[in-house]
Amino acid sequence: MTVKEHKVVHEAQNVEALHAPEHFYKSQPGPSYIKDMKQYKEMYKQSVEDPENFFGEKARELLDWDRPFTRSKYGSLENGDVTWFLNGELNAAYNCVDRHAFANPDKPALIYEADEEADNRMITFSELLRQVSRVAGVLQSWGVKKGDTVAVYLPMIPEAVVAMLAIARLGAIHSVVFAGFSAGSLKDRVVDAGCKVVITCDEGKRGGKTVHTKKIVDEGLNGISLVSHILVFQRTGSEGIPMTAGRDYWWHEETAKQRSYLPPVPCNSEDPLFLLYTSGSTGSPKGVVHSTAGYLLGAAMTTRYVFDIHPEDVLFTAGDVGWITGHTYALYGPLVLGTASIIFESTPAYPDYGRYWRIIQRHKATHFYVAPTALRLIKRVGEAEIPKYDISSLRVLGSVGEPISPELWEWYYEKVGNKNCVICDTMWQTESGSHLIAPQAGAVPTKPGSATVPFFGVDACIIDPVTGIELQGNDVEGVLAVKSSWPSMARSVWQNHHRYVDTYLKPYPGYYFTGDGAGRDHDGYYWIRGRVDDVVNVSGHRLSTAEIEASLTNHDNVSESAVVGIADELTGQSVIAFVSLKDGSSRESSAVVAMRRELVLQVRGEIGPFAAPKCVILVKDLPKTRSGKIMRRVLRKVASNEADQLGDLSTMANSEVVPSIIAAVDEQFFAEKKK
């Protein structure tokens, strides 16, 4: 591989842009919302040059208002007072449920794919309206009112969606806590948000295993007088679930007492719709605050224009409502547009690796949205299942959560999409609310490995991290920032606006700082590098850890890799690579030592001597969040001999791997340094 000058986005060299396959157009229920690149550019230009009129028109078109807004946009990033749709009033639940229930009562709203397929069910918009109203009635009878916070600790079942919409119906604020979090993590989030009510279930089911959900809630809330009521849904119906008299109430008993329709409460555009906690590098998790109108519009617009979603379509987002992906693209995005959403409780491997494809075949899903982590798993061990099912209904394949490598992109396109689908690699984050960089399906040609172009209103730019100056033109690399506000961006951190300003608005005054490194290629397409702290500067060479990781995973025996930079007295930083092998080897032996040397030489040969890892550490597994992201900051701390300063680990799914990683670093890195 030829090494390009470091400022050039070399991944884009000799990469041809792909236009939408013929199948995409033939299978559409209606014309594309954006027909071609020319129309995208015209709309994008208006969205950044005249956002007031552009988004004002879209807000009136896509949302129903109780009171019209008087001005579309106010405030600035500099002042941290971003405001959209001033003086307008609306209700999120009405926009997601009522208006569709009145127009198409029997249309599917939620398609539930349970852990055990025999438990599958479907909920129409009219039934969803009844369920949401009844749960809202229960909450209202308990004194929940506009502006109150309510915690939701439920697995990925329809009742999680019902609970969120019931809270929004009252103008209250939902704070969903992923049902895989520990009792301590739940406690921290409930207390920080000030939730007096928690909605949960008796037990959960995932991958054929039972999760003792209510037991976790009881443990987390032990001694917490703040919580006065807990509503418990019977997911499994198991006997012996402990219920505290005067605090715990069964969902089915309480909802039976309520009316089937409860009028929605009008909310101001800027009233908080929800909190969602995201883990910081250190300290306590941040409760990111999203507003009602701006967030809803962002969810609606990106779902419509990025995915080219029509009301007749079926969207399968394989993400949990405990994360922003589930909020925006399993709930609010599809439902505000009146599109059916598949709610998936299980895993891609249960009861076998054909599960995803059976779901798509059974419901004729048109859109599939999933994380690269799941795709890598299927590519490694489940690819043979794909041809067994008719998944020709698919039109758009989405990727979310991390940059997708060009190799995995092409596999997704060929093996899952059969070269008939558009691939939408989407870059966004909890704080953005909806897509920041993503192709508009059918209009924007795509490139394997590139998230492509900014969404409407996202005035994206590349900043030199050293000088803080915006880099003009194409073929530039730096950090990704946004020059002005967009409707769905987070407004604050719960009860800590200073933290919000310090984290996102202060690093580069006048810009929103995404925290991601990126390159803008010769065509103006964006290539996401990952977190800025995942960029390593070795002897003046800025190295993308993703590029080094790609080189490592090109080796036939490498399963996964993660690269971090640590301080180095000679070179400023040095590259440390953590690698898990397909054969599971991690202990020292002559073969393992040879493998470590071989991997160093591979990077040296493919990228250059300056990119060669100082050390390759073989581990059995890498630390990951519950959404599948590798926690590189944990690896960096361990490699920096700071294993006693790992910070917040509440989002880690496999904390049991940490001791073995520490041992591997001691054996393969620190011990060798002493020799």
UniProtKB/Swiss-Prot annotation:
SUPFAM superfamilies: Acetyl-CoA synthetase-like. It holds the Pfam family AMP-binding. One of its GO terms (biological process) is acetyl-CoA biosynthetic process from acetate. ATP binds at residues 401-403, 425-430, 516, 531, 542. The gene is ACS2. InterPro entries: Ac_CoA_lig, ACAS_N, AMP-bd_C, AMP-bd_C_sf, AMP-binding_CS, AMP-dep_synth/lig_dom, ANL_N_sf. This is Acetyl-coenzyme A synthetase 2. One of its GO terms (molecular function) is AMP binding. Keywords: ATP-binding, Ligase, Nucleotide-binding. The keyword Transmembrane helix does not apply. CoA binds at residues 206-209, 325, 539, 604. It catalyses: acetate + ATP + CoA = acetyl-CoA + AMP + diphosphate. It is an enzyme of class 6 (ligase). Its EC number is 6.2.1.1. Belongs to the ATP-dependent AMP-binding enzyme family. GO terms for cellular component: cytosol.
